[in-house]
Amino acid sequence: MIIVLSPAKSLDYDTPAHVPSYTLPAFVDDASELIHGLRKLSPQDIATLMDISDPLARLNFQRYADWSPTFTPANAKQAVLAFNGDVYEGFDAKSLSSTDLDYAQQHVRVLSGLYGLLRPLDLLQPYRLEMGTRFANARGKDLYAFWGDRITRALNEQLETRSGAARVLVNCASTEYFKSVKPKLLAAPVITPVFEDWKGGRYKIISFHAKRARGLMARFVVENRITDPKALKAFATEGYAFDAAASNDSTYVYRRRIGE
């Protein structure tokens, strides 16, 4: 089983990593090519391209200038410890043991606009480049064109080492990021967990809660060493429960009703 997550825009480089082990990203040459193009942009260009504030644009202008193809613990941090958004609050890698993180290294992947595909312990230099950014490059009009089928092929390399029910990809990424994967070319079926909360008289996806729940699901897989997708149905963290009637073979729906 491989579970894929989206990255986070929020990053934490202040908290020291609680594990010393790390690995290097697989697509450093590709990231270097993107950085080369990003360095041609002014802070105002970055603000316009990414629809971000001027201070944030200046921060990322400097990040691109500082970025190095050489990754060390001095200029980078393990990806799953550096990302700090809703998904990663749910995953809470800081409280996972080194043994848990070693398991995550084999079963969790993070999709990235700059780095393509990351393992949890791959070193990450700070950046901002969302997958949906229409950043024209030598390979096409946007990052989907840039990455082509590279991410899918990298996932297949991992999936092909699994067999039976364990050869499955669990999609806990956003629509924006999972568009960088080509399901028809994958060497495994895809299961997408969907998390809904009761609000206004019906169940609906509430972005903040759904993002956190994706991280909780990834943690559930890691802590319980899950390889068979049927075991995902037992997920019941923070009040969610599997709804068989609303689910099918490719979409697992989890619902939560608090209050009302």
Swiss-Prot record:
Matching entries from InterPro entries are given as: YaaA (IPR005583)
Lineage top rank: taxon:
Bacteria
- Which Gene Ontology terms of cellular component type are present? cytosol
List cystine links. none
Question: What GO biological process terms are annotated to this protein in UniProt?
Answer: response to hydroperoxide
Kindly give the HAMAP family that the UniProt entry links to this protein: UPF0246
Assigned protein family: Belongs to the UPF0246 family.
Know the name of this protein?
A: UPF0246 protein BceJ2315_22780
